[in-house]
C-alpha cells in the first residue's frame, strides 16, 4: 500500500469542499400558541437573523388537532424588519391536514410561503400571522425558516 502525501493547503481545500457538500440544512421553526377554540388574533413570532447572505425558504406551520377541518386558509402575514420596514400581504393557501394515523390527535401542516428569501438586515424580524376569519382546531401557528441549499 502506497502512502500519499498531500500538501497542507490541498488537504485543507479538500476538507472544506467535503464540509460544504455535507453541510446540514439549518431549519428554525418559531411558533406561538393560539386559541384552539377560535383562532382570530395574530400569532406573533420573532426570528433573529445573523446571516445576510444565505437564502431561505419560508413555510407557514400550523399545529392542529382533530377539530381542524379546513382545506384552505386565508391569512394576513405582516413582517417588520430590524430597520422598521413593514410588509403586509393577504394570502389564501391550501391547508388540509394529513393525519399520520387514525389515532393521532394532532399533526403539523407545513405550507410553502416564500422561496429564496434573503434577510438583508441583521437583527430581529417580527412576523404576525392573522387568520382572515375564525379558525377552529389550530393550537399553534408559526414560520419555518429553512436555509436553501
Q: Residue locations for each model-derived region?
A:
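C-terminal motif of bacterial Sec signal peptides marking the signal peptidase cleavage site
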Residues: 18-21
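Bacterial signal peptide processing site
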Residues: 23-26
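Post-signal-peptide N-terminal segment of Sec-exported extracytoplasmic proteins
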Residues: 43-73
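Noncatalytic modules at the cell exterior or secretory-pathway interfaces
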Residues: 53-60, 116-133
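Short acidic/polar inter-strand loop motif in beta-rich domains
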Residues: 66-67, 109-119, 131-140
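Exposed low-complexity, polar/acidic, P/S/T/G-rich flexible segments that act as propeptides
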Residues: 79-80, 133-149
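An anionic, turn-rich surface loop/hairpin at beta-sheet edges
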Residues: 89-120
Amino acid at each position: 500500500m502506497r502512502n500519499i502525501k498531500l500538501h497542507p493547503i490541498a488537504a485543507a481545500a479538500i476538507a472544506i469542499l467535503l464540509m460544504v457538500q455535507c453541510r446540514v440544512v439549518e431549519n428554525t421553526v418559531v411558533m406561538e400558541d393560539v386559541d384552539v377554540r377560535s383562532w382570530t388574533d395574530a400569532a406573533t413570532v420573532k426570528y433573529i437573523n445573523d446571516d445576510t447572505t444565505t437564502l431561505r425558504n419560508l413555510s407557514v406551520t400550523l399545529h392542529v388537532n382533530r377539530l381542524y377541518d379546513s382545506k384552505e386558509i386565508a391569512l394576513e402575514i405582516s413582517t417588520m424588519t430590524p430597520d422598521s420596514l413593514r410588509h403586509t400581504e393577504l394570502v389564501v393557501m391550501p391547508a388540509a391536514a394529513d393525519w399520520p394515523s387514525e389515532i393521532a390527535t394532532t399533526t403539523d401542516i407545513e405550507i410553502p410561503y416564500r422561496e429564496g428569501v434573503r434577510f438583508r438586515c441583521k437583527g430581529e424580524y417580527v412576523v404576525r400571522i392573522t387568520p382572515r376569519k375564525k379558525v377552529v382546531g389550530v393550537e399553534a401557528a408559526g414560520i419555518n425558516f429553512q436555509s436553501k441549499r
